[in-house]
A protein has these predicted regions:
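Ligand-binding loop in jelly-roll beta-barrel domains
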Residues: 98-128, 234-271
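Short acidic-glycine-tyrosine-enriched beta hairpin
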Residues: 81-94, 207-250
Length: 296
């Protein structure tokens, strides 16, 4: 087995979207090649309702699919197909914009005013960009959780992991999307298909992906349960870690444990032309999109 080395890592960047929602952009609107088939990912997390309550009013999408994963709080949504509903703690929404859809997403937070979730954009291949739009809300009870003997918890949101199939299905990118918690100072390996590109995004605790390929030989600065460990190059909260080639990912959890998303997909390898929420093959197609969506 070949452990995937870290190609690069960086912190998510603060930005503002929608009608004034403060969030952190994990990646997006730049070079998409390291993330293909994924286009963008946002971490929307805030304890102050004034920084998210205005939400994301009516806006269009075309040529993409989105996966929204709510950790805490509530997001109310509606679209031009007549669908409406809400997402709460642990719920997911998968939306295929396809040929075009107009929708809104309005975060409401929880009883303490806290809101936390993620939205991931996946590209649609050229032969599916004009497919009929559709969406599905998935409740938290539908998500399988695996608990290892060492206390590691793996939630399978999409893909097939150790025989457990995630409820998010039918996405062109065929993503594997895992929410993983590893207890303090535990070392874990996770299989990773060699044909896929992928990344980890840390949102709680910290850990080491850089030196995890040699966990035993790392000298120890601190004693824990009779053993010594040195945790170098720790990556912490809001850190994106992008992997190079290999067939597994290894991580050494830090002293507080680590929780992260591990996401991969099969590259589409097609041109990407952005016009805000519209993603097509060329700029000429994006300019033709808005009039046709709003005329529906």
């Amino acid at each position: 087995m070949a452990i995937r080395p870290v190609k690069f890592s960086r912190l998510a960047q603060p930005t503002m979207e929608g009608a004034g929602v403060n969030l952190h952009r994990v990646f997006g609107f730049g070079d998409t090649k390291p993330f293909d088939p994924f286009l963008m990912m946002d971490d929307f997390r805030n304890d102050d309702p004034n920084k998210y309550m205005k939400g994301f009013p009516w806006h269009p999408h075309r040529g993409i699919e989105t996966i929204t994963y709510v950790l805490s709080g509530t997001v109310e949504h509606a679209d031009s197909l007549g669908n409406n509903g809400s997402l709460s703690d642990g719920d997911i929404q998968w939306m295929t914009a396809g040929s075009g859809i107009i929708h809104q997403e309005m975060p409401k937070g929880n009883k303490n005013g806290a809101m936390h979730g993620f939205q991931l954009w996946a590209n649609l291949p050229s032969n599916q960009k004009m497919t009929a739009p559709r969406y599905q809300d998935i409740k938290s009870k539908e998500i399988k959780s695996l608990v290892d003997d060492d206390g590691t918890i793996i939630k399978v949101i999409a893909g097939d992991y150790r025989g457990y199939k995630g409820p998010v299905d039918g996405i062109a990118a065929e993503p594997e999307y895992l929410d993983i918690y590893i207890p303090p100072l535990k070392f874990k390996r996770f299989p990773f298909d060699t044909s896929r590109q992928g990344f980890a995004y840390i949102f709680e605790g910290d850990g080491d992906f850089h030196n995890a390929s040699n966990p035993v030989g790392i000298k120890v600065e601190k004693e824990f349960n009779g053993q010594e460990f040195e945790l170098r190059d720790l990556s912490g909260n809001r850190t994106l870690v992008v992997f190079d080639n290999g067939d597994e990912v290894a991580v050494q959890a830090g002293e507080k444990g680590i929780r992260f998303l591990l996401i991969s997909g099969t590259p589409i390898k097609e041109p990407v032309a952005w016009h805000g929420p519209i993603v097509m093959l060329s700029v000429s197609y994006t300019h033709l999109t808005l009039p046709t969506i709003y005329s529906v």
